[in-house]
Amino acid sequence: MWIPTEHEKYGVVIASFRGTVPYGLSLEIGDTVQILEKCDGWYRGFALKNPNIKGIFPSSYVHLKNACVKNKGQFEMVIPTEDSVITEMTSTLRDWGTMWKQLYVRNEGDLFHRLWHIMNEILDLRRQVLVGHLTHDRMKDVKRHITARLDWGNEQLGLDLVPRKEYAMVDPEDISITELYRLMEHRHRKKDTPVQASSHHLFVQMKSLMCSNLGEELEVIFSLFDSKENRPISERFFLRLNRNGLPKAPDKPERHCSLFVDLGSSELRKDIYITVHIIRIGRMGAGEKKNACSVQYRRPFGCAVLSIADLLTGETKDDLILKVYMCNTESEWYQIHENIIKKLNARYNLTGSNAGLAVSLQLLHGDIEQIRREYSSVFSHGVSITRKLGFSNIIMPGEMRNDLYITIERGEFEKGGKSVARNVEVTMFIVDSSGQTLKDFISFGSGEPPASEYHSFVLYHNNSPRWSELLKLPIPVDKFRGAHIRFEFRHCSTKEKGEKKLFGFSFVPLMQEDGRTLPDGTHELIVHKCEENTNLQDTTRYLKLPFSKGIFLGNNNQAMKATKESFCITSFLCSTKLTQNGDMLDLLKWRTHPDKITGCLSKLKEIDGSEIVKFLQDTLDTLFGILDENSQKYGSKVFDSLVHIINLLQDSKFHHFKPVMDTYIESHFAGALAYRDLIKVLKWYVDRITEAERQEHIQEVLKAQEYIFKYIVQSRRLFSLATGGQNEEEFRCCIQELLMSVRFFLSQESKGSGALSQSQAVFLSSFPAVYSELLKLFDVREVANLVQDTLGSLPTILHVDDSLQAIKLQCIGKTVESQLYTNPDSRYILLPVVLHHLHIHLQEQKDLIMCARILSNVFCLIKKNSSEKSVLEEIDVIVASLLDILLRTILEITSRPQPSSSAMRFQFQDVTGEFVACLLSLLRQMTDRHYQQLLDSFNTKEELRDFLLQIFTVFRILIRPEMFPKDWTVMRLVANNVIITTVLYLSDALRKNFLNENFDYKIWDSYFYLAVIFINQLCLQLEMFTPSKKKKVLEKYGDMRVTMGCEIFSMWQNLGEHKLHFIPALIGPFLEVTLIPQPDLRNVMIPIFHDMMDWEQRRSGNFKQVEAKLIDKLDSLMSEGKGDETYRELFNSILLKKIERETWRESGVSLIATVTRLMERLLDYRDCMKMGEVDGKKIGCTVSLLNFYKTELNKEEMYIRYIHKLYDLHLKAQNFTEAAYTLLLYDELLEWSDRPLREFLTYPMQTEWQRKEHLHLTIIQNFDRGKCWENGIILCRKIAEQYESYYDYRNLSKMRMMEASLYDKIMDQQRLEPEFFRVGFYGKKFPFFLRNKEFVCRGHDYERLEAFQQRMLNEFPHAIAMQHANQPDETIFQAEAQYLQIYAVTPIPESQEVLQREGVPDNIKSFYKVNHIWKFRYDRPFHKGTKDKENEFKSLWVERTSLYLVQSLPGISRWFEVEKREVVEMSPLENAIEVLENKNQQLKTLISQCQTRQMQNINPLTMCLNGVIDAAVNGGVSRYQEAFFVKEYILSHPEDGEKIARLRELMLEQAQILEFGLAVHEKFVPQDMRPLHKKLVDQFFVMKSSLGIQEFSACMQASPVHFPNGSPRVCRNSAPASVSPDGTRVIPRRSPLSYPAVNRYSSSSLSSQASAEVSNITGQSESSDEVFNMQPSPSTSSLSSTHSASPNVTSSAPSSARASPLLSDKHKHSRENSCLSPRERPCSAIYPTPVEPSQRMLFNHIGDGALPRSDPNLSAPEKAVNPTPSSWSLDSGKEAKNMSDSGKLISPPVPPRPTQTASPARHTTSVSPSPAGRSPLKGSVQSFTPSPVEYHSPGLISNSPVLSGSYSSGISSLSRCSTSETSGFENQVNEQSAPLPVPVPVPVPSYGGEEPVRKESKTPPPYSVYERTLRRPVPLPHSLSIPVTSEPPALPPKPLAARSSHLENGARRTDPGPRPRPLPRKVSQL
């Protein structure tokens, strides 16, 4: 049976459990589990990492841990009772683990590695804590390290600041909010402002001395020198070096280094230097022989200095090399370091160029104990400590020092009868009173043990030597008396024996007879003469002699005259036990001189403070001894002396001695009667304060009152102990009288001078320290009443001195911080007076910082859960006194501007935060009773209204993001919890008092506004938190957003008809709330919108306002990243359900649908905008949203905003044409008026005319950059008209020049024609604006199908490319996936006159072929009926699909949606007609190009003629004859009579063209190709005979073929899918011939270039029953065009191999050898004059199997070749230039074709008209549709490596083109030769259906361009002359100006103007 667990609540998994048993819970080792129930060795519970999944697991798998349970029951919370630091470490490391991996993903390597080291360090420290073997101090140290690293990691990762107390996390529920704030602020300030260390230490390590002339041992002496004061400031660090310059004791590294300690900040300045003096030990002269002398002398060697400023920049861990200078003049040795510092080192020599002293220096900061811990490895070896000279800045009690510093300064000696000066050495000894030498009390420096004697260094031949050597004598105090120092002087001989001869001595006693030590300063000692054998061991012989000249001069002047020798030393005593002050000794020995007591007491103030504190206890005993001796006589004097000593301890240097005095009072003070005299004297001083003129002494007394009361209280306690409590009442009366005097003194006002105020301030400063002393004698309530009366006596008038006000407040603050205030009984007495003074200051807004601190302390004492009666009463008092003023104060200080300086800003933030914390503390402590009392305290509704408005405003301020630092989440959550609790209380008051007739809009609006911004706080968005953090917040506070949301809903429902006041104002705020991804909150809040719609419907009959506001806010909110797909669905479903029964349901559904659709588009837009690069999705999504705002919502401002967003996207993607069209949308909204427009987006305030002008110029610029110059010309004309109307001729001139430049660009610059692709987006995973729709996209320059398909797959990486072109079924539409269907389509231009006119250059026509395109199509061949295996063309039909777009391309996007599709089936006969028409047109073009020398060689024409004639001879067109001219077909298809006749006409026309072509070919064919030409002529006659043609009539021969537009025309778009009858098999063939320098072009049979769309189709190749499938292709060329060898044609595949989903692998390799399509190169690099598609040919170089490429090193102009005058032009007067001279070619004109009257094909839903020819840049792709009329002899093509077989069964054709890089064609042709005459062809009619009516486009309409040719006429031979039928047209007219041209019938016709545009809409003031 499962039973709930009592103690087993928490455990850690010690072995992984798979949970394979029923209800098993899968656990991993290390997981923590919470246990709910147990049963027979099993537990039931959950893992803390996933508390939602509960299950069972074996109890043996879990290690139980102690834990405490909070909130027992269903929602119990288990907290482990282990060390809180361990718990925090565990949870923090888990959080870090996830984030640490993310750092690696984000490539933040530095932080990644640093955090890894910190995590490992924390784990190691965690193990140390868990083991539990650490001492208390070590444990504290480890925890400090742990928390420091946890805080560092949290800060680096952007996590929350953790409040801590004693290294443990603090639960905010367990402490007051003010205390929580202080903890947070302390940690935050500690993080931001590191504490500057007050103590510094210098670590010095000696490495070596590098010098070339070593060989003797050395002494190195380090010290710190103050160059400003010219004195050393530290002891010396002494080190011995061996002969190699290395430390002498290598086994003792601690001797190599020292720590110079206790350097204050004042010592860290640039004039403090490290000085190094080096002394050598050896011979007198450095150059003497080694054996010259056996005696060793100390001799000067060198000196080095270093400024300590060089170390202040940071830690110097690298060794420093100090330059060592040698002293040339030994007499200056004592000041060598000073001269080097002063840069006077030129007088010294360096020890060597590479010489130097290698040292390591490091500056350490902090307390010495901290340094010991951090550098324990150094201190563990006993590194020497080098002290400062004298005491530290702070003298610590108990510090024992007795150091006498002796500096051997200088000496004056006589020659002693010698001719040269002496070499003097000084030897020093310390001798005690018995004459014995004291051992080991002479210290040369730290690092060297003390010695018994000292030998000075020797200066060579110097009778006035100066040494300046500092020595320390650490002599014990007990050995000082009677001891003296003896100095012996010896002359050091330089002779071989090296003798030292004693010639004199000096001595100095250490202590004088009166007990004073040797005074500090310089002492000139007498040098007493003596001999070497003089016995100085007997001290009695010389101690009676005078030792100092100063003393001797006073006693015996005559004796002094005998000696001129002297010796000077300087002494300095640093002792805590001995004194040099006689006055101090006199005071301590007062009993021996009673008569001097008064004088001694008076002189006490003159004694140095360090002397007093050294003998503090003795001094105090002396004072109270004198007081006991005669209190009447010495009472006031002793009191003053005591005050002086007390105040001396206030000095920072001596404040550490306060505990010494406290100890004295508690343990050593024995003055039981002293209290009487102390009270009496103190009262005497207080009574005279108001009368005294000088208050300085009185203020000193008041300053000392704390310790005076301590002495009074201790004295009274001693008296009570001694007497059993006698005179208690008397004592109380004395205290009462004293305090009455104080109260009187405090109540007085300062009159005139501020002295009284200063005295009052001094008293108040120290008065709170008295409380604790009074509590030792009086009851708490008594003391509280005394203090209350005293503080109450302060003057409350506001005009008193501000400084006194501040001191008064400080006194209040100290009172609150005192022990007295912590007691509830005394606190209740003191609280009113504290609050009274606080109220006054807050009301005046004075001393806010101090007020905040006091308030914080007040609330720190009130715990959260304290429900004691006294606490409740305190809260009552505080609420009544301070709540209102506290709210006003917060409002006041938060409305002020923040100070600029950082220090003031911190102070400002602190005071604001503390007041906020105080308010929150107060509100958290308030209970229902407090709130009720508060609300009842307002007498009128106006007062209540003001209070509610005030507190709501404050709450809004409190939840501002800047109120607390961003990582203070704990504080924010606590604040929010208090706010929501308070709001719940106050909402009742709102309902009860401000509804119905008392309704107040302002207060309700303030309430709702507060609630909304409360919910929207960033710190409450739990979705952004880590799982562990979210869990903690939910456990402690729940989701406060839902609570507040429910409150909003409840309050809204209470409003009733007053809801109308908040519609539509609250729609936006509420909408923002509902966008928060919290399901419960959304379910609560969304229904409010239904309520708003309902009330708005009641008021106005509609809810337009609601709709408008919803739409406006949705855009801005969703652009901020709010909202998601779930919200859209929830919004839709909830509101639809709500309005089901409403009468206005229909309009409501419409609104909801509109808003939902807008959300769909906004979500798509936001998702797309997250992408990095600009792609089609971004642009398409923006277009969708833009159109939605315009068409469905009519939101003009939003529409314009998105126009500019789209414009920016286009510019970024360099879609300049689309950018121009986009900006044109805004331009159309404006008029040429002077209406002023406001500033909007990037536009300044300007008139509508100016903005429209600016837009025009910008659009023209973009059309220019996009090479859409025709559109730019239209806008140039429009703006020129405006300039002309305003007579602005300057700008008019510029505009006309700009227009002219655009015309030049049309004629001179090349333009690449884009490909067009149809893209289908299927499946539900696509964005809304693409889902299950098809589009036609305009490709980028040079972009082919493969590249486009790859681009689309990159944009949609999860999409699947469909492998067929069939319409997808419904399963694809509804699939939860993305499917892409892509294939190329052919643009069908609108019928425009410019495309059919003669003489219009192709540069002009090319624009209209690919611009303003609404219609596109592609074809699919299929068999209908029985398939004839002998002639498949009988049953081969073509399915032609036409696509109509919603807008023409190009436009505001590179792609537009397909609005309509039409499918037409073309019969086999119609297909045959198209094939022949296009092949004839191709032939005409090639012949024309050859005739006018536009071809670089004749190979293309040769190939084309060969293909057509060969195919015809071998049965080509006979297939058509067999299929359509037989009797059976004619009888069975009587309706096709006209079409059959048309087919026959085309055959005859082809024969005429071929004959004329052969004549031209013969004229230009090179010699090596003559055999081929002869063969073609022979085969042509065979072909004619096969067609039943013998000879053309004479009249037909008389006229040449007339080519309209100057060339034979290939109308690829008129019938692009013509199919020839012999296309059933694909037979690859190779030609054995490869002609160098000869172009080979495909010239397959009757199928033409117009069958381009068939190139997208895969047809049957072997089996006649195969289904023909559509294939993607980047081009739309035909099977047999001159460009049929495109990259998409393979030798074995019947369709494009490019991205072909059905192409087998064996075919795909052929792409590598395919030719480039012409559009892959600049058109002029292929042919000089771009005229017609059939004229664009690609030169393929045949050689080494290399594919042709456009030279990448050539610029576009270099690749282009300009056109030349045509020799076919009837109005040319000059013959064409040779191409080698001019590089220009031009095509002959092409005659117009009459309209055909044939009927369209059957099964046609819509038949498109015959469009103009395709762009010259269009590459051609071999169409699958075979042609029977092209054939090449096997001998020509059977084995050619670059030629492939035709698709005709058994009929070969050239399907690849080969070009050469050079051509000799132009050199072989006579420029004057004329073409051969050919018969005039039969007119070719065209057929087609009606073009559907198109909607108006927003793009500039195409305009007709009639250009009068500038070519000079060239006469033609009579045989080729063509009658003049028309004159070339003039230039295009200006808009609205009628232009006419001569037509063929002689009539004039007016040039049609541009397509009418809609009237511009009125635009708002944008």
From Swiss-Prot:
Residue numbers of Phosphoserine PTMs: S1599, S1607, S1614, S1618, S1620, S1631, S1769
Tissue specificity, in the record's words, reads: Widely expressed at low level. Highly expressed in skeletal muscle, prostate and ovary.
Q: What is this protein called?
A: Dedicator of cytokinesis protein 4
What keyword terms does UniProt attach to this protein?
Cell membrane, Cell projection, Cytoplasm, Guanine-nucleotide releasing factor, Membrane, Phosphoprotein, Proto-oncogene, SH3 domain, SH3-binding
Which is one Gene Ontology cellular component term of this protein? nucleolus
PANTHER family noted in UniProt? DEDICATOR OF CYTOKINESIS, DEDICATOR OF CYTOKINESIS PROTEIN 4
What does the record give under GO molecular function?
A: GTPase activator activity; guanyl-nucleotide exchange factor activity; PDZ domain binding; receptor tyrosine kinase binding; SH3 domain binding; small GTPase binding
